[in-house]
Amino acid sequence: SHPDTLVFGRTPPLINTIEDRKRLISRLFGIEKVLFLPFDRAMMTMPWQDFIDDLLISTYGAVHLVAGHDYHFGHRNQGDPDKLLSRCRERGIGCDIIPQVTRDGITVSSTYIRTLIESGQMERAADFLGHRHCLTRTVTHGCRFGRTIGIPTVNLTPPDHVLLPARGVYVTRVFLPDGASVPGVTNIGTRPTVSDGDAVSVETFLLDFDGDL
């Protein structure tokens, strides 16, 4: 879960799911194995020294750490980049601190990227993310009305606590389970092809596609 869930009792919307994040890290950086550690009360109250020594080095065998310029860790966020660098030197492992990154004079941050996605500025969001925003979900079979008008549609159930772009219609590309991809047009909002009340849905019209999902 997001640290804010435990610390502040609220869950901010995530930019993507854990599964999507793993795939992105593997694809963009060539990392074969990605582990996400659950943030629980034990981790929240762990002294920053123990976080490095016992968890990262002893448990996971870390030999090189990479962190952002504003990274904080350990009980009450007492660990910071300077302490991380110093501790890594003492323990004989490598450490890199990534400096602040700006684009057009704006600091690249998850908070700003969330703002762009929420307002539907997907081109600019992609520029700050370094890749197109993506969402992986299992197809929800509906009434198959799209097929009756010659355009197959894919209905996706929005994941909990994951940020969706502003309501609207977007040009998209759909990646299928077999690795193929097809162009699509995605509507986020109430479903235009069938009445579904006020429930927010993600409905994609598949172009140049003839098959079953």
Task: Walk through the language-model features, giving the residues of each.
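A residue-level signal for conserved active-site and pocket-lining positions in enzyme catalytic cores
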Residues: 25, 125, 172
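Glycine-rich loops and low-complexity Gly/Arg-rich segments
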Residues: 18-23, 58-63, 90-92, 120-123, ...
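Classical nucleotidyltransferase
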Residues: 42-152, 179
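Active-site donor-binding loop signature of nucleotide-sugar glycosyltransferases
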Residues: 39, 100, 188
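Phosphate/ribose-recognition catalytic cores of enzymes acting on nucleotide-derived substrates
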Residues: 142-213
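Short N-terminal signal/transit or membrane-insertion segments
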Residues: 17-34, 134-162
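Core alpha/beta nucleotide-donor-binding catalytic domains of modification enzymes
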Residues: 1-58
